[in-house]
């Protein structure tokens, strides 16, 4: 028996493959089962081109057998088998794939696709074994051969006995080390779990003899073990079934089986696409937020299959971050894989699938909003924040995709409204989309700044999420209507000059406001008569792009830089408090300072900002009460 050398740079390549390409040892079983499936596919293909042959499905299967005592694991199939020449060509050359060659030479028909595209899958056996034997008998041949290798040094091929055609791969499992427990690859439970995880949708039965117990015949109180053959895999994936044959319950059961969440999905999308790229997908929109969704630990992504074989547990490239809440699977035969099924190339097919999926999700959410408003609002309570992050991120490049999905509470109704609904009912004289920012709807309703806008009969959107205003700054406008905060220095309301403070009033109180500005030096940019206040004596407005609420959010972040918005103290000159200010200005400068500090701190409290010196503030209140 002659030992032959591998025809590639065997040692270096084999070491590279074992140590670098595959990051999880358990995938060896996935690779070997996929090869077995390919071998049966080749038999099926022959029956399509040879009328004298018949394909009896029950005759074709894959068997996994564990022998713990001898530390042997066997994977057998009833596939096409290999001749001596094929054993040498396919297994003697690392990185040569018989499946790939077969695929090139033959046109695969009727939805059957050869899974294997590269020749290193078989060599993943060396992840768990340092003694690999292959016994194979080719279809239509009377001769069988045994191929054996103990690593990169080479291999042997010799004749052997085998009754039926097909292939057996026999692995002598490695002994345990301090770093690795190889015993688990002989355990029934582990093997069954790996098959379910990676190969559940291989289209041929994967069988195992499972250990079970039953009462002894002579003593029912005692139990004995016995073996029973079971098919481990489901074979037909739900996404390849006819949608008309499936019920909502089938999708909900699949959602639960895949452990996508403890809730029921609020919506599912089952799609089959044929075109430039072909794929099947089932996508789920959850009802509730996963506990870790808004943390760094959360990992987005869809399960990615190639011809029913799991390639990646979470393929993040298939989902944009703003749709990261979507769960589900994608299965495609068009994906280009590199030499391991674990790592996917960032190729054109994947990008096309991702683009298509993004559009599908967007359309489904828009449909949900229009046709099932209650469901959409429930979804939005859980994931609306993520959509707003999507608008804000990437410098607003996704705003056109997401803007019609946004919702906010408003002064008009006690429920959420869309931007389209807001704009559709704007009065003709209203130039802007007005919004107010606060911790809650109740707090916003009490804001002094909102009075002037509401008095004009204009609707105000309520921003209660810290991301809201940042997202709107990126959105900039909606249907050519700009957004305007009720705290803006200029509200852009027609006729506000006539209805409130006249220019003569501003001139008359100029010296008073200058004195108050000096008292608050460094704290406010200006003090002026308010054009928005009706019932309240004072409020803070802001000038520039940075609002007071944005200041609060940014300063609450780690490593804040003490960012400050440009604030303006606005005084209601029609309020009784203003009379007290004028009297103090004319007769008691100390009292003017006292009143000014009190009003400024009052305005800070209304905005939810911290008072610089609470003790001084309380002392000032006590002075007034004496």
Swiss-Prot record:
Residues 498-509 have a biased composition (Basic and acidic residues). SUPFAM superfamilies: ATPase domain of HSP90 chaperone/DNA topoisomerase II/histidine kinase (SSF55874), HSP90 C-terminal domain (SSF110942), Ribosomal protein S5 domain 2-like (SSF54211). GO terms for molecular function: ATP binding; ATP hydrolysis activity; ATP-dependent protein folding chaperone; unfolded protein binding. Residues 553-626 are annotated as: C. It is found in: Cytoplasm. Residues 1-341 are annotated as: A. Coiled coil: none annotated. Keywords: ATP-binding, Chaperone, Cytoplasm, Nucleotide-binding, Stress response. It comes from the Bacteria. The keyword Transport does not apply. Its main location: cytoplasm. Homodimer. Belongs to the heat shock protein 90 family. Molecular chaperone. Has ATPase activity. This is Chaperone protein HtpG. It comes from Clostridium botulinum (strain Langeland / NCTC 10281 / Type F). The gene is htpG.
